[in-house]
Structure formats: structure tokens, C-alpha cells
């Protein structure tokens, strides 16, 4: 701390002499003030004193021109806060202490101390110096806020307008490691919320847009960073405004409140309305019921290094009046905060979520409004870190993102609030049981975390949904609840043996613990109902997107078809190569002379699509080149090639050039004549066989539809793959997932897995999504 004193520093305070006389005689000019030594010190005394071990860490300041020390007696007493200590007016040379006016009267107004010699400080110079310092500080603060701009944080549809943490920090224009708090403002539309923030934090600059028109100028949630107080300031949309999506916008306010450390409720009414107390009371109840749990989960899910307090923010009710007195003016003995609590109690609202509620009022006889009292109250609360500590901006963004992801989605008109600002319907799952109509009690979007629906009451049976569940009676009596389903065969039977047993003794009910507990045709007569003997029935809720619970899982017919298809497909795949080779050779033998041989056609002559082994190649009857089906789907007469007046297959180019006759010589026509007759005969035979195959396909489709399990989507309703949305065609076959029953292409359903809940105990086809589900299907 000590240093050589320059000549310029000497003579700054010629009236202030060293008060220690430790290394001098007390005649040297004071250069330092040590608050812990309670004295002014010259350079030599300061250096010699603070070489000692016990005095080495004392805080010293270098004196400025016109410096006046603090009073030594009243320093630190209750009632004097740091920064408002009394300055001394005299120094007692005998007692060697500095005294303010009050302490001098109290201690030196009588007795021998009255005759003690004193040194008077120049207080007028001090006042001018302090005013200059305050002016400099005010100018510095204004300069810090000159470049502050606000940005849209969340729009009116509850969608966050910043992409990630880095984008949020960049728009705030603060350091990533800066610790800050969040201050937000609420109130009715037109009460001057944006104007209040501009004058309280930004010295009147229009950081948040204001407007004299009737339309609200603040739509959604806007944010800005105050570098002076190191807070993120959030401006919100006003209540009671003429807006659409009112329910979603009201829910958005509670998300902002949940991430705030300090909330200002701005009201410009001559008397406090009930809307204020109802809003804060309902917000407190919804915060405790829905948000505290989610904020705790956010801490664990996002790996936040700062705990999010379950206590809500502090609230300041900023009340501006014109014609009426402020709250508590007619009851000087009662503080306004107690009157506020009484109003809450009368309305049956209990704001337990908020850490504290404060009242700050101002009466505006003549504009402009005085915001200094609000600013001082805010600064005191921001310094209090007992409940809510400052945190990194990334933590604030993660909390807002987690709340937005959880509590999002449209709110139906029939769930609009009538008696409460924040009804449960704004935050709970909107799914209703299809059987009894009861709503789910879980939070919104709980399905993303794998949490199933749950209702407060029991369900009733509906024949339409068959919402029964069988549980093994023997396991239930042992204290376990094990669900069982009727199915074709036991898990220990092979597929073909299971079909044989099913044909003889009917379906089975198998328990994982007890094995096969029931067969429907175990005896020739006298078979009892399983509900009376081995299972118990429970009625469960039917939520949207789920199937019935005891639908017919007897899939014997489908298993038989699957087995036959597997064998037929295997034989077909083994014989595909030789069959195609023979077909191509035979086609080339009877093809006209101008046709390009199949062996030379490797890709479509127009779109250049490469042909696979099982793809069909088509010849244009006009030019003779090879094409795919889509590039040669048109027909027209080609008499110049000997095909007569009947329309035949041609490529797209020849179809468009149909008015241009090809120059074909008579020699060419004679040469093609013999092979053309052979080709016509071949096509006639092929068309006849194709008609027979089509006639066989129709009853085969009926058989497949009859064998389809009840939970499968019918083939005629499946137009595209349920996962990749590709449209089905002759080349793209339909496949059913044995778990969900939806239609998929082969690429999206190539996994194999047992589905015991549907009666498939051996690995069968399942889709990509069902295969990702944990546990048994």
C-alpha cells in the first residue's frame, strides 16, 4: 500500500496533519486514512505502523483534496448502514478522535472535555467534493447503458426466439461467466410497464418500446441486460389486453415469473384492485404445484451447477396514484405490507411461493413520475442473496428452455380460465380417457420422458374399447400383479407345434411365473371361463393413441400365412436369377430385329436408372430402345413398324414425336415381319397368364384380410409407410409391425423381436420405433 509520495500529492490537504505521531512529531501532512486504525497518517507513520504483522492487512485509502474523515464514535452503531456513515466536523486533539456534530454534543458538551482543543474540518469543501463524485458516478452509469438494446426472448406463441445459450449471451451482451439476477415486470396493459423499466434501469432511454396508441406495443417477452446493476431485465405483455391465444400468453407469464429473482407488479390505479391479488395468489399456487417440481428436475436433467431455489421470487408492488393517498397513509401505525397480507387473506389467496412481498408507492401530483424510491428498493433487494443467488446466464436460459419444453402446446377453448388466472388445465396433460372422459393428472409432455398417463379416479368398462386387463389370480394372491393375455400358443411351443396344439385345444393364457394356466378347449366339454378360475379382471383407462387391451390376439391364421409366404419367398429368391436369365433369352429370340437385346440394356434410355435383377425392362415399339415403366407408359399406333392401328407401348420421346413418320424401308419391314408375329403371339400368351394371376390375387387378398389380427391396420387403409412416409407401389411392399399393427416398408421394419403381449412369443417383424422400446413388448 505504501509508496513514495510525489511532490504533487503534497499540499492537497494542508489542514490535515498526521494524527498518529508514530514516526513523526505530528506536524507532517496526512496522506493516508486507515479506517481500522481510526486515524489519518503521514507517509512515514503509515509505512512504519503497517510493517507490523498484526496491522499489515489494514485497509488504507489515499486522501483526496478536501477529504473529511468519518466520525469514530457513531461508526458501526445500529442504524447506520455502510455508505451512510456520518462525516466528522471536528477532531479532538486530546482524545485523538474524529467527531460528528451529534457525537460532539453528546460527549464534549460538558465537564473537562469541553475545554479540549479541537481541529475543525472544512465541511463545505467536502459537500462540493461529494456532489462532484456523485455527478461523475451518475455520468459513468448513464454511459454504461448507452448501447443497451432489447431483444425478443419469447414470442406470443410461447416459442423461444434464441437458438441456444451462446445466442442468448450474445444478445444480452454480457460475459458468459457473469453472475446476474433476473428482474421482470407484470401488470395490466397500458399501465406503463415498459416506461417504468426504462426510467428505473436505463435512465429514461427507450430500451423497451413504448407507444401512445391504443394498441399494445409489447407482444411476447422482451429482455435486456443492465450492466450497472448486473441484472437481466424482462418486459412482459400486459394483462387484460385484447389478444388472441389469451390462455397461452397467460401461461407464458408464469414461466417468466418462475425464472425471475425479483418481480415488479406495476399498477397505475388510484386504489389496488382485486385483480392484482388474484393474479399473485393464483401464480403462487400454480408455481408451487407445477413449477417447483420441474425446476428441481431441471437441475438434475441439465446438470446445472447452481441449485434453483424452490422459493419463488421477491415481489414489489409499485403503486402510482394521482388523486388518492398511498396505502397505509391513513394507518401510520401499520406497515403497508401487513395491509397487503390482509387483502390476500380476505380474498382467500395465499402467496406462499414468494419469498417476500413489498409495497412501494408514489403519488404523482405533476408529471414526471418519481422512480427513485422504486430504484432504491430494488437495489436493496438485489443485494440480498439469502434466497436467490446470482447465476450464469446459461443457467437462466436452461431453466426457461426446460419450462417451455414441458409446458407447451395449444389450450382448447373449453379450458379457458374463468375463475382463475392459472388453472391446472394450463399445465397438466390435455389427454382424456376415451372410456370415462377423465383427464390425465400428469404434467404436459410427460410422454417425452416415458411417463405413462395417470388419472385420479378409476375407469368404467366400455364394450367399444374392451378396456379389461387380465391378471394372474395365483400371482395376485402372492402379492404380485402380473398381466396375462389370451394368445394362440405357449412361449415354449415351436411355431408349427403351437399351431397344431391351437387347432386341437384352442387358445392359451400363459403367466410368466405359473406357465400355461388355461386352455380354451382343454376338455371336450365343461370348459370354464378363465375369469371364474385363473384370472382376475381389472378395468383400466383408454388413452388416445392406445389400442384395446383384450383384443383378439389369436394369430393362428396369420402365422400360417407367414409360414407359407416365407417358404414361397425362399423358393422365389433362389429361382429368381435363373428364371430371369431364361426369360430374357426367350424374349430376345422372339423380339423384332430393331429391338435392342435385353442383355445390352443396363439402364433406362431416358432417365438412366440402372436396372436391378428383378426389374422389368420395356421396349418402345417405335424406336426399339429399352426403358423403365414410368418412361414408357404411353401408347399410340405404330403402323410403320408393322404393329397395325392398335395402340402399343412407346417411350415418351416417340409419343411426343408421333406426327413425325419414321423413314422405314420396305426391306426393313419384310425383315421384321417374321419376328414381329412371334412377338405378338408371345404378348398374347403373357397377357392371358397375367389375367389368370390377377384373378388369383383377388381371393388371396381376401384371405389375407380375413387372417389379419384385429389390431392390424387393414391393407386398403395403408397408403404410405408409417415411418418414412414413402408411398406403397407394386415394387414397395406393405409389412405390418407385430407390436403396433401399423404398415411399414421393409427398410423401416426389418428388426425381429418377440411380442408376447400380442401373442408372438418368437421373434417376428417389428418396426423401428417399437424396437427401441425398453422391456418386453
Swiss-Prot record:
Result of changing residue 543 to A: Disrupts its localization to lipid droplets
Chain intervals for the UniProt region annotation (Required for localization in the lipid droplets): 416-777
UniProt keyword terms in alphabetical order: Endoplasmic reticulum, Golgi apparatus, Lipid droplet, Metal-binding, Mitochondrion, Repeat, Zinc, Zinc-finger
Positions bound to Zn(2+) 1: 604, 607, 628, 631
Coiled coil, from the record: none
PROSITE patterns from the UniProt entry: ZF_FYVE
Descriptive protein name: Zinc finger FYVE domain-containing protein 1
Annotated source species: Homo sapiens
The encoding gene: ZFYVE1
Amino acid at each position: 500500500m505504501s509508496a513514495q509520495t510525489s511532490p504533487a500529492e503534497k499540499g492537497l490537504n494542508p489542514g490535515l496533519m498526521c494524527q498518529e505521531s508514530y514516526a513523526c512529531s505530528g506536524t507532517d501532512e496526512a496522506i493516508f486514512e486507515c479506517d481500522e486504525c481510526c486515524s489519518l497518517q503521514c507517509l512515514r507513520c503509515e509505512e512504519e505502523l503497517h510493517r507490523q504483522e498484526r496491522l499489515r492487512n489494514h485497509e488504507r485509502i489515499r486522501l483526496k483534496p478536501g477529504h473529511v474523515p468519518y466520525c469514530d464514535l457513531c461508526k458501526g452503531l445500529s442504524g447506520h448502514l455502510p455508505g451512510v456513515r456520518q462525516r466528522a466536523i471536528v477532531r479532538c486533539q486530546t482524545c485523538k478522535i474524529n467527531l460528528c456534530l451529534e457525537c460532539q454534543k453528546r460527549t464534549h458538551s460538558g465537564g473537562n472535555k469541553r475545554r479540549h482543543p479541537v481541529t475543525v474540518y472544512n465541511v463545505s469543501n467536502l459537500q462540493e467534493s461529494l456532489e462532484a463524485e456523485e455527478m461523475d458516478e451518475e455520468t459513468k452509469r448513464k454511459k454504461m447503458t448507452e448501447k443497451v438494446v432489447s431483444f425478443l426472448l419469447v414470442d406470443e406463441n410461447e416459442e423461444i426466439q434464441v437458438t441456444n445459450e451462446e445466442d442468448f449471451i450474445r444478445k444480452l451482451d454480457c460475459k458468459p461467466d457473469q453472475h446476474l439476477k433476473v428482474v421482470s415486470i407484470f401488470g395490466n396493459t397500458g399501465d406503463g410497464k415498459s416506461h417504468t423499466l426504462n426510467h428505473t434501469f436505463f435512465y429514461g432511454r427507450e430500451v423497451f418500446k413504448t407507444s401512445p396508441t391504443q394498441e399494445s406495443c409489447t407482444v411476447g417477452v422482451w429482455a435486456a441486460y443492465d450492466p450497472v446493476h448486473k441484472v437481466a431485465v424482462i418486459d412482459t405483455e400486459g394483462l387484460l389486453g385484447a389478444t388472441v391465444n389469451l390462455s397461452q400468453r397467460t401461461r407464458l407469464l408464469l414461466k417468466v415469473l418462475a425464472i425471475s429473482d425479483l418481480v415488479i407488479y406495476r399498477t397505475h390505479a388510484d386504489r389496488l384492485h382485486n385483480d392484482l391479488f388474484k393474479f399473485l395468489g393464483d401464480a403462487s399456487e400454480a408455481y408451487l404445484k407445477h413449477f417447483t417440481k420441474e425446476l428441481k428436475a431441471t437441475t438434475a436433467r441439465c446438470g446445472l451447477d447452481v441449485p434453483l431455489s424452490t422459493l419463488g421470487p421477491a415481489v414489489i408492488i409499485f403503486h402510482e396514484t394521482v388523486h388518492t393517498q398511498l396505502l397505509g397513509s391513513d394507518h401510520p401505525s401499520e406497515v403497508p405490507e401487513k395491509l397487503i397480507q390482509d387483502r390476500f387473506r380476505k380474498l382467500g389467496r395465499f402467496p406462499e411461493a414468494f419469498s417476500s412481498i413489498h409495497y412501494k408507492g408514489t403519488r404523482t401530483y405533476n408529471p414526471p413520475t418519481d422512480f427513485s424510491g422504486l430504484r432504491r428498493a430494488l437495489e436493496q433487494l438485489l443485494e440480498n442473496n439469502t434466497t436467490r443467488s446470482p447465476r450464469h446466464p446459461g443457467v437462466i436460459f436452461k431453466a426457461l428452455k426446460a419450462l417451455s419444453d414441458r409446458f407447451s402446446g395449444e389450450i382448447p377453448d373449453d379450458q379457458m380460465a374463468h375463475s382463475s388466472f392459472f388453472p391446472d388445465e394450463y399445465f397438466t396433460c390435455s389427454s382424456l380417457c376415451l372410456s370415462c372422459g377423465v383427464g390425465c393428472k400428469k404434467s404436459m409432455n410427460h410422454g417425452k420422458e416415458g411417463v405413462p398417463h395417470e388419472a385420479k379416479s378409476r375407469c368404467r368398462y366400455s364394450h367399444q374399447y374392451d378396456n379389461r386387463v387380465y391378471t394372474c389370480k395365483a400371482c395376485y394372491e402372492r402379492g404380485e400383479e402380473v398381466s396375462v393375455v389370451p394368445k394362440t400358443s405357449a412361449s415354449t411351443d415351436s411355431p408349427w407345434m403351437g399351431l397344431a396344439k391351437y387347432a386341437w385345444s384352442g387358445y392359451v393364457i400363459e403367466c410368466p411365473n405359473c406357465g400355461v394356466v388355461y386352455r380354451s378347449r382343454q376338455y371336450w366339454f365343461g370348459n370354464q371361463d378363465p375369469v371364474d378360475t385363473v384370472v382376475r379382471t381389472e378395468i383400466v383407462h383408454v388413452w388416445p393413441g392406445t389400442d384395446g387391451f383384450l383384443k383378439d390376439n389369436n394369430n393362428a391364421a396369420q402365422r400360417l400365412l407367414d409360414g407359407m409366404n416365407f417358404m414361397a419367398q425362399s423358393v422365389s429368391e433362389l429361382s429368381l436369377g435363373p428364371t430371369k436369365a431364361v426369360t430374357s433369352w426367350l424374349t430376345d429370340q422372339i423380339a423384332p430385329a430393331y429391338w435392342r437385346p435385353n442383355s445390352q440394356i443396363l439402364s433406362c434410355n431416358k432417365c438412366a436408372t440402372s436396372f436391378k435383377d428383378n426389374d422389368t425392362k420395356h421396349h418402345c415399339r417405335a424406336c426399339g430402345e429399352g426403358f423403365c415403366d414410368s418412361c414408357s407408359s404411353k401408347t399410340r399406333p405404330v403402323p410403320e413398324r408393322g404393329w397395325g392401328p392398335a395402340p402399343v407401348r412407346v417411350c415418351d420421346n416417340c409419343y411426343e414425336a408421333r406426327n413425325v413418320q419414321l423413314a422405314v424401308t420396305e426391306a426393313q419391314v419384310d425383315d421384321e415381319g417374321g419376328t414381329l408375329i412371334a412377338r405378338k403371339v408371345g404378348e398374347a400368351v403373357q397377357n392371358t397368364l397375367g389375367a389368370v394371376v390377377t384373378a388369383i390375387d383377388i381371393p388371396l387378398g381376401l384371405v389375407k384380410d380375413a387372417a389379419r389380427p384385429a389390431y392390424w391396420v387393414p391393407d386398403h387403409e395403408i397408403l404410405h409407410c408409417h415411418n418414412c412416409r414413402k408411398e406403397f407401389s407394386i415394387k414397395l411392399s406393405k409389412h405390418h409391425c407385430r407390436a403396433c399393427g401399423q404398415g411399414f416398408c421393409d427398410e423401416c421394419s426389418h428388426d425381429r423381436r418377440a411380442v408376447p403381449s400380442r401373442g408372438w412369443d418368437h421373434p417376428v417383424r417389428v418396426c423401428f420405433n417399437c424396437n427401441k422400446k425398453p422391456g418386453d413388448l
